[in-house]
Amino acid sequence: MKYVYTSILFLLVANFCSAQDILSIFATKGPNAQQSSLELFKRYTNPLAESYSWAISMGWNHTARPHRPIGFDISIGTAAVLIPDNKLTYSVDGIDGVRIISGNPQVPTFFGSNTASSVIGVKNDDGTESIIPATRGVNLSAAPLPFFKFGLGVFKNTELMGRIFPKLEYNGMEIKMWGVGIKHNIIQWFYREKSPFDLSVFAGYTQADGLYPLEQSMVAPVTNPGNMLFTTRGGDFEAILSKTFPLVTFYISSGFAYSKNNLQLVGDYTLLYNKEESLNIPPNGVTEEYELKAWKFGGGIMLKFGLVFINGDYSYSEYHLISTGLGLTLK
């Protein structure tokens, strides 16, 4: 099982550590140039923050029907946020003192091309210009978040739920995730007899954390490149309607996602060959925050063969969202 976990982790982040020279963005001089560097960092990482802010809100439900008391299910699943083309690149337009010296004017974001070779110029406060190679992407079109999920029926058509991706380490990289939720069938308050369908409300909380080693700066090598820390936490609130047949369940949902994402660079950014200087990073470090507040709408299908079920669903909002699962259930 640990081998499976490690393989998933490798697929998720292996490209990251082989392609990104993020620190060179801050090889500039002066407070005005620092703001330009911070804006470049924001435009590069914003799709990463956005996608995982969405990913943690997905994959909770495959039916509106809660388990009976002591009924349960356990499954493995993956939530994936599809990255649109307009999130694979960004433009430096509107950033004070920044220009494209050579190469494509559309620069890769985190998920963009890993072969692009644009060169960016950033005007320093002393009138000089820093020449910086554009940070390459990881060449991925989706942001996946795998997990183990379980649910337990308690009382009055209520189900307690949880999910986890245990902490794993691979070549200095770390990733972990956990979440808790509760689902309650409200249709019982409207139908005295058995309802032809199920209607439930759900609330859940999820937190995902990652740590990625940073590449040494090619422009201005530093004492310790350190890591990029990644934390996403937030809630998911949904109404789910489903219709169950002997072998298949159809479900639709509407909900509100709220989450916060924090990206932080942590290292010793004193220049390796000049201990009197450091990268142009704010005294309190580089911290990029992103907040998501948005509605989402979706639907899916669950196929059940004895105790085994398979489900898949699609949700639409600012991104296209897909989740799948495979598990065992006992009502």
Model-predicted segments: where are they?
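Residues on the lipid-exposed face of transmembrane beta-strands in outer-membrane beta-barrel proteins
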Residues: 60-65, 74-76, 148-154, 180-184, ...
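N-terminal, post-signal peptide beta-strand-biased segments of exported outer-membrane/organellar beta-barrel
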Residues: 19-97
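Extracellular/periplasm-exposed beta-strand and loop segments of Gram-negative cell-envelope proteins
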Residues: 87-89, 110, 121-140, 169-175, ...
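Residues that define the transmembrane beta-barrel architecture of outer-membrane proteins
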Residues: 68-70, 141-146, 174-180, 231-235, ...
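Repeated loop/turn-to-beta-strand initiation elements of outer-membrane beta-barrel proteins
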Residues: 157-160, 189-192, 247-250, 307-312, ...
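Bacterial Sec-dependent N-terminal signal peptides
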Residues: 1-23
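Short loop/turn motifs that connect adjacent beta-strands in outer-membrane beta-barrel proteins
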Residues: 62-70, 85, 187-199, 246-248
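Transmembrane beta-strands of outer-membrane beta-barrel pores
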Residues: 78-82, 164-168, 186, 203-209, ...
